[in-house]
Amino acid sequence: MRIVLAVLGLLLSIVSAQADKAVASGRPLKLYEAYATNPDCTSAGAIVLRVAQPPGHGRVSINQAGVFPSFPQSNPRSACNRRRVPGVQATYVSQRGYLGPDLVVLQALFPSGRGVNITVAIRVM
């Protein structure tokens, strides 16, 4: 019974998000960035970011990077907004000369156990 509840809890903790972006053909486009930050601005743990569905007309690179967080002023971590914190970024580059639509689905797994699926529709111009 506990295993079923744990699996159900994990499935319910995966959230979906959608975004639309435009980019010039062959130019890099930041698709997504994520961070897990303690109140002292140190990392709260590693984030696993992976490509769940690759683009049909380009490539996605995932790299560890310093990112600027955007915590609301009411959050004790808002002091971290003024500096880079450890994070991860996904960047898209289309095939050279390609013009048209593309689509990427990313999956981010946070140290807290929360998961997010991110669908990004891309218009390559």
Which residue stretches match the model-derived regions?
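Well-ordered beta-strand positions in beta-sheet-rich domains
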Residues: 48, 103, 117-121
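Core beta-strand segments of extracellular beta-sandwich domains
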Residues: 28-41, 47-52, 106
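Contiguous, well-folded functional domains in the mature portion of proteins
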Residues: 78-96
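C-terminal edge beta-strand
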Residues: 20-21, 32, 36, 112-125
